Structures are given as structure tokens and as C-alpha cells.
From Swiss-Prot:
Pathway: Amino-acid biosynthesis; L-tryptophan biosynthesis; L-tryptophan from chorismate: step 4/5
Pfam families hit by this protein: IGPS
Protein name in the entry: Indole-3-glycerol phosphate synthase
This protein's UniProt keywords: Amino-acid biosynthesis, Aromatic amino acid biosynthesis, Decarboxylase, Lyase, Tryptophan biosynthesis
EC numbers for this chain: 4.1.1.48
PROSITE patterns, alphabetized: IGPS
Molecular-function annotations in GO: indole-3-glycerol-phosphate synthase activity; phosphoribosylanthranilate isomerase activity
UniProt cross-references to InterPro entries, sorted A to Z: Aldolase_TIM (IPR013785), Indole-3-glycerol_P_synth (IPR045186), Indole-3-glycerol_P_synth_dom (IPR013798), Indole-3-GlycerolPSynthase_CS (IPR001468), RibuloseP-bd_barrel (IPR011060)
Length: 252
């Protein structure tokens, strides 16, 4: 099995055991899409709280998610990404809930979402943005979840990895599209994926390049075509995440 197949098999088990929550009031914060459109002068940063990953193993198991998130916010991050997958990334919905309670900026639930139950749970925990990964979903399931998330007043970051998936995301009408430089089947990373797909971008969409960024020079490779980058591991390994995050905010 590939990494993605293994993760999705486990996710089916998790979701089957997950209760369907009643929808609660949504946390108040700004629209991430509107924020990106209003601040085009700099590459914006989505800074991630991630304890571990399937390919790298333990990254920072002792991290306090709230302290980490507050450091990111102080550095000027536009949004916090919180991994909520418990098995492969050692995250939890409680991490998301605690971060959302303690920062003012948007928080995205980073998980392999396959059910409306996960969307409701994420919203109730304080997420205002959710991730939908095209390679993890059929086109029909993607459309259904996108519509359900929109009905819940959640912004949706639709993740793609190749030209075919990019076309699907644009056809769907996604306003936030993330290009993952990581192949979810092999977990290999190549920033050139973002450089290549930028040739086929449509207008009025905000594009985020995800994974593989360690330096300002890395960010500079995609700064002309993208509105933001998502960075996790590089920040999680730093002793001073606030200083590290500030280094990654480059001009476009």
C-alpha cells in the first residue's frame, strides 16, 4: 500500500466511529481568501502545527500547540494549519480546538477529510477553513464535500498535485487552491511541482504552494505566481519558530 492508501484505510475506520455532532456557532475571524486578495505585496504564510509525519516520523512530539501557534501569529502568519490526524501525524481535534481558542487569525483543519462528520467537527472546534485533497477523493465525493463545507460557511482549500487535479479544482470553482509539492503516494517533495503547475493558473483564484520550504530562497521560487506558502516541518524543528517564520515572508 502507498502512504495515501494506508492513511485512507485508517480514516474510514476513524470516521465510522466518529459521532455526528450538532452544528455550533462558527468562530469569528476574517476570510482567508479576502485576506490574501487584500495583501498581495508579500507572500503570506500558513504556518503549521505538526508533531510527526509518516515519512519523517517524530518531528516535535513535545510541542505545545498553543505556544507554537501564538509564535506563528506574532510572526505575521495569515493562517495556522493544525494537523488533526492522530495515527500518522500524532495530532488531535483538541489541538485544533485549543489553537483556535487562543489565536485571532483563521485556522485550517489539516486532515484527510472524507465525510461531512469531519467538516462539522472541524467547524465546531474552531476551524474556519478545511482541506479537501483531490487525490484522496472521487470527483463525486469531492463535489459533495465541497458543497457541504460551503453550506457550513467554511472556506475550502482544495489540494492538487498535477495538471489533471488542477483542472478539476478550477472546474469545481475553488477560490483557494493548494499545490502540494509532496506526492502523497510516495511522500517525495519537489518544489518544481508548483513551478510547473503555475503555467495553467486561472484568475480570481488564490494559490498556495505547500511543502518543501526551508529558506526564503525556496519561497522566492514561487513568489510571483502564488499568494502564500504552507510550511510545517521547517518551522516545527526551529528553536525560535517566530524568527524562522518571519524569515519566510518575502516580497512578491
Amino acid at each position: 500500500m502507498t502512504f495515501l492508501e494506508e492513511i485512507l484505510a485508517q480514516k474510514v475506520i476513524e470516521v465510522a466511529e466518529m459521532p455526528l455532532e450538532k452544528v455550533k456557532d462558527k468562530r469569528e475571524t476574517y476570510s482567508f481568501y479576502d485576506f490574501l486578495k487584500a495583501h498581495p505585496e508579500k507572500m503570506q504564510l500558513i504556518a503549521e502545527v505538526k508533531r510527526a509525519s509518516p515519512s519523517k516520523g517524530e518531528i516535535n512530539m513535545g510541542v505545545d500547540p498553543v505556544t507554537q501557534a501564538k509564535s506563528y501569529e506574532a510572526a505575521g502568519a495569515g493562517m495556522i494549519s493544525v494537523l488533526t490526524d492522530p495515527v500518522f501525524f500524532k495530532g488531535s481535534i483538541e489541538d485544533l480546538r485549543e489553537v483556535a481558542r487562543n489565536v485571532k487569525i483563521p485556522v485550517i483543519c489539516k486532515d484527510f477529510i472524507i465525510s461531512e462528520k469531519q467538516l462539522i467537527r472541524a467547524r465546531n472546534a474552531g476551524a474556519t477553513v478545511v482541506l479537501l485533497i483531490i487525490s484522496a477523493l472521487s470527483e463525486a465525493a469531492l463535489k459533495t464535500l465541497f458543497e457541504q463545507a460551503t453550506a457550513l460557511d467554511l472556506e475550502v482549500l482544495v489540494e492538487v498535485h498535477d495538471q489533471k487535479e488542477l483542472a478539476i479544482a478550477q472546474k469545481l470553482g475553488a477560490k483557494l487552491i493548494g499545490v502540494n509539492n509532496r506526492n502523497l503516494h510516495t511522500f517525495e517533495v519537489d518544489i518544481a511541482v508548483s513551478e510547473k503547475l503555475a503555467r495553467d493558473f486561472s484568475t480570481n483564484v488564490c494559490f498556495i504552494s505547500e511543502s518543501g520550504f526551508k529558506t526564503a530562497e525556496d519561497v522566492g521560487r514561487v513568489s510571483k505566481e502564488y499568494n502564500a506558502v504552507l510550511v510545517g516541518e521547517a518551522l516545527m524543528r526551529e528553536k525560535s519558530p517566530e524568527v524562522a517564520a518571519k524569515r519566510l515572508k518575502v516580497k512578491r
